[in-house]
From Swiss-Prot:
Pfam families: WH1. The lineage of its organism: Eukaryota, Metazoa, Chordata, Craniata, Vertebrata. The WH1 domain interacts with the PPXXF motif in GRM1, GRM5, RYR1, RYR2, ITPR1, SHANK 1 and SHANK3. The coiled-Coil domain forms an antiparallel tetrameric arrangement. It comes from the Eukaryota. It is found in: Cytoplasm; Postsynaptic density; Synapse; Cell projection, Dendritic spine. The modification N-acetylglycine is found at G2. Keywords: Acetylation, Cell projection, Coiled coil, Cytoplasm, Phosphoprotein, Synapse. This is Homer protein homolog 1. It comes from Homo sapiens (Human). One of its GO terms (cellular component) is cytoplasm. The modification Phosphoserine is found at S306. The keyword Phosphoprotein applies.
Amino acid sequence: MGEQPIFSTRAHVFQIDPNTKKNWVPTSKHAVTVSYFYDSTRNVYRIISLDGSKAIINSTITPNMTFTKTSQKFGQWADSRANTVYGLGFSSEHHLSKFAEKFQEFKEAARLAKEKSQEKMELTSTPSQESAGGDLQSPLTPESINGTDDERTPDVTQNSEPRAEPTQNALPFSHSSAISKHWEAELATLKGNNAKLTAALLESTANVKQWKQQLAAYQEEAERLHKRVTELECVSSQANAVHTHKTELNQTIQELEETLKLKEEEIERLKQEIDNARELQEQRDSLTQKLQEVEIRNKDLEGQLSDLEQRLEKSQNEQEAFRNNLKTLLEILDGKIFELTELRDNLAKLLECS
């Protein structure tokens, strides 16, 4: 069974161009497993990465090596034995920091192992090999190297709640007219707000384009500075000057990255404003549709009211004719009653005379 790695992660692997000593050349088409191993037979620590069956990194860690973070997700180190500079691009700053911590830890372990080895050689005693906890003394295999990183990014889901629509109840004509006026006023207000939001949206779009141009310029400048740092680090004859320039350039890169972060936050804010403007536009369209429905309802109520008025007028005319007929009948009845009264009086007089 192959020797197990002490620590593994995944990253994109690069090497410095051996001709120009400036540009990075990718040695893997995608992220591969990069692992730390302890070679107990030679008492050294190694960084090994395989792309299939091909070893794209086989670097022995020495006490004088330094792992440098050149950005939030990129780090590099120079291997004088392999006469090259390795670069690793990680998926997050956390993975880069973890790899750098392990590099420093195993670098210190390599220094201590070297000192112990020298002391034992001076004492001409048989060296005892001590392996790191959990390591197996067996040859390295691709199967043992290509592990998986134990860092996982949780998925985030977004839940949206549907908005309840108000119920449409039948309204009397007077109430319906009041609601219609209310919706018209609301629509006028929304039109004014929509005009303001449209202007703000156009301004935000122009600002986004400007930020993107500045962002591209900053990224290009940061890439140029990264290449410059790599070039300076590879020139061993100018170590002091390289260190000074490297510090200045790293500071400049950090400032540029902070500026980029601020610009990205500004872009996110502008995107949020655009989303809000779109939401208000959707609300305006919904209110416009509701207003149209209310207007249609008003027309229906007006038709019903006109029909009721005609029916009422017809009923009133019929009642007036009935009253006139009744009045005529009453007058005739009064005449008949008067005649009957006279007849009764005359009959009474005849009875008295007889």
